[in-house]
């Protein structure tokens, strides 16, 4: 054990104990909180179905940093490099377009076998897998509609894709012993003002009911639905709005996905967690960083990330909130993006676990808002970094920016050859 990390840890334990916080218990609790890393940061959401195809659906990956993964083997190798630099439990979140097959596979015909290599890889690394149907970057989504499409044949294609995706997801959970959270997001919407806002939503409602009709083992599979305010090319109307999906998740008792970038810039999902959790059994979070719009910048250790973590910890939502990341920055080293964003999410969770919440809650109940504010601010200066370094030490990962050297070495010897 590195001497200075050990010394700082011992002092930090004393400091936190003085305010009623057990730092050792915080580390144990942090090990109960896996963060689901998204595979699509590694290749700018290209996937393996048609890697040279255009990214559609109102989303954009900007930048052209060299070395992006070109196939599944490279993507898994890049993920391995990132995983080595992130302490604690992780999961991997896959989209349907990351299937592997020697021959073309229609999206409504995907099967668990097309993801067998991912399952074997995840099992070897003791990772859970999560899943998503890919309702974008496809000829049948080109006019901006999928599950709400007015053409019943096209709509049925996407229903079948989502049904097939659920079976893939359930196979993940069954094989790996941890439920796969499958999130449905669709890009459906209109660029300009529609006349009929209701009909597409009626179609979406019926389509979703058809998608989830087959009963799957909840120990293997969890359904989630995700709203969005707007996308590029769908600025005026989004079929799957927040109100639509909140109503759907509450009435069908699915999980609700809250994406940090899918609301108006003045809204934050940290404030929505405690409201939505009263009506739905589970929440899926897509922690991201919207800059003026749903830009999916790399997650920072900023106020909103900290507030999201605080809501999970303060309300003991360990088993009801699933933490996922969703960003894709093609302007920087993609492995570094994974490492920075995931470590920041875990740092935020640790800081929340080190908060003297019981004391702060009592001050609030007593109406002593002066002391509440004072202690909230003072606790920000407590030596949480020393606790983080101990956590990294125990998980055999770099405790500080030393991880960047490993990324640079990999970039020089692997990424630069692509």
UniProtKB/Swiss-Prot annotation:
Annotated EC: 5.3.1.14
Keywords assigned: Cytoplasm, Isomerase, Manganese, Metal-binding, Rhamnose metabolism
Pathway membership, UniProt: Carbohydrate degradation; L-rhamnose degradation; glycerone phosphate from L-rhamnose: step 1/3
Catalytic reaction equation(s): L-rhamnopyranose = L-rhamnulose
InterPro entries linked to this entry: L-rhamnose_isomerase (IPR050337), Rhamnose_isomerase (IPR009308), Xyl_isomerase-like_sf (IPR036237)
Free-text remark on how the cofactor is bound: Binds 1 Mn(2+) ion per subunit.
A Pfam family it matches: RhaA
Gene3D superfamilies: Divalent-metal-dependent TIM barrel enzymes
A Gene Ontology biological process term: rhamnose catabolic process
Gene Ontology MF term list: L-rhamnose isomerase activity; manganese ion binding
GO cellular component: cytoplasm
Requisite cofactors: Mn(2+)
Positions bound to Mn(2+): 262, 294, 296
Domain of life, per lineage: Bacteria
Places the protein is found: Cytoplasm
Chief location of this protein within or outside the cell: cytoplasm
Enzyme class: isomerase
Quaternary structure note: Homotetramer.
Similarity annotation: Belongs to the rhamnose isomerase family.
Annotated PANTHER family: L-RHAMNOSE ISOMERASE
Purpose of the protein: Catalyzes the interconversion of L-rhamnose and L-rhamnulose.
Protein name: L-rhamnose isomerase
Organism lineage: Bacteria, Pseudomonadati, Pseudomonadota, Gammaproteobacteria, Enterobacterales
Gene designation: rhaA
